[in-house]
Design a protein with these regions (language model features):
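Short, acidic/polar
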Residues: 1-8, 58-64
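Catalytic-face loop-and-helix region of soluble metabolic enzyme cores
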Residues: 21-121
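Catalytic beta/alpha-barrel core
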Residues: 4-28
Length: 123
């Protein structure tokens, strides 16, 4: 991902936020931020992607990324909505049940990310 970001930046692509696939190690998250912010791009940030992974893996990635300055959020759509949406389509959940499941899981992800960010601020 570092090479891709560098190549895109060198070609003139200058997003304010880079979407980064889930990373297991803090050091890798730090490298991604350093790459995104290289050469005077201090205002550029990153978000972590869920890649449709299972809850456990996404929770690990969110916790790891949130602890690093420069990661400001996440995009975990499929991880959040896939199972409840499939259950609704298969008529094993009502619409209201699916909506509640999606909202509840998303709230858990927000709380997890924000909690890890708060820990970063105290460090």
């Amino acid at each position: 991902m570092e090479k891709a970001i560098t190549a895109l930046q060198d070609a003139g692509v200058e997003p304010d936020v880079w979407k980064i696939e889930g990373l297991d190690r803090r050091e890798d998250c730090e490298k991604m931020v350093a790459t995104a912010r290289r050469d005077g791009r201090e205002r550029v940030n990153c978000i972590i992607l869920g890649r449709g992974e299972n809850d456990e893996k996404v929770r690990e990635w969110l916790t790891t990324a949130a602890a690093v300055d420069g990661f400001i959020g996440f995009a975990v759509g499929r991880t959040d909505f896939w199972d409840p949406l499939t259950a609704w389509r298969n008529k094993t959940k009502t619409r209201d049940e699916a909506v509640a499941a999606i909202a509840g899981r998303y709230r858990e992800f927000v709380d997890l990310f924000e909690g890890a960010r708060a820990g970063r601020a105290k460090a």
